């Protein structure tokens, strides 16, 4: 079970515990829009992979975008080091992977993680998330081998947090 930190960790922990599977992280960071940091225009991971929404970045200052991408890559690497505490990443080549997040509003971070995991020659990628809009579910189903989502609303409320009673930020310590 691979969690996208930080929000995906509590969800992934419960899945790993219930299925008696190993738990690790896959450190991916959202690149937020300069005027609304919660809206993803791209994603980066700790392995220096990146994915951007080409339509969204057309009107973004390229210098700002380059700096933001680099900043988020460094943060992804920092988090990977913190969460692993010197331990090696799980060996996932030729393994089935359950990729978990707390939800997917745009799907960019999960799509990047899927692309990166495919490069690592995983056997099967199953995305497990509590909620995602219908249009994103379609994209994730095409990108991954399987999608398990508890809710796929036709009319998404705009943010993953709207589907939680308590959507407090998960700290690095937690």
Regions inferred by a protein language model and the residue ranges of each:
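PRPP-associated nucleotide enzymes
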Residues: 1-174
